[in-house]
Amino acid sequence: AGYEPLSLLMEQREADSEKGREILGRIAEVSGEIPVYVASNEVLSEISGFKLARGMLCAMRRRALPKMEDLCGNARRIAVLENVVNPTNVGAIFRSAAALGIDAVLLTGGCSDPLYRRAARVSMGTVFQVPWTILETKDWPEHTMKQLRKMGYHTVAMALKEDSLRPDDEKLHNVEKLAIILGTEGEGLAADT
């Protein structure tokens, strides 16, 4: 997924297993030698704050986030998340985006981080597959919406209104580039969006 491993924390039984040695070998091939820390399951649970089901944690360096213009350049369908604060919801949206063929996800600064453990877990790993970036807070919504329209996107809001179109409405079938905007939990989209 393009993330650089920094260190590995694992149970002794995992370090001694064939699978564990295989994983360590693959990491060494790609990234060279990294620090490997070994401890009992109890110590790992205490350090991490949760029970490790697989007995292994890897700290990774975050990639630099792409610019919106680079991310959306060749994309046809994008999702824009406005202040979706619950990591579970962010993960579920990424999983749905992957299933629906969404090419990229843009998140406002008020959104939960897609790399939070809960978001990544609920997404079933799709946060590492669907390209995404975080928008500059100062640019949302006015500048970002102008930029999307300038790039050829039609913007549509996921909102329950009397004049709403169904997602399968024929008016949307021939739209070349579509930006689907989803609002925060509870209140939905802000009035100025």
Q: What is each residue range found by the language model?
A:
Residues 1-4, 10, 15, 22, ...:
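RNA substrate-binding interface of SAM-dependent RNA methyltransferases
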Residues 45, 118, 191:
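Alpha-helical elements of the RecA-like P-loop NTPase motor core of helicases
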Residues 156-193:
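Active-site/ligand-binding-proximal alpha/beta "capping" segment
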Residues 58:
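Glycine-rich phosphate-binding loops that contact phosphosugars or nucleotide phosphates
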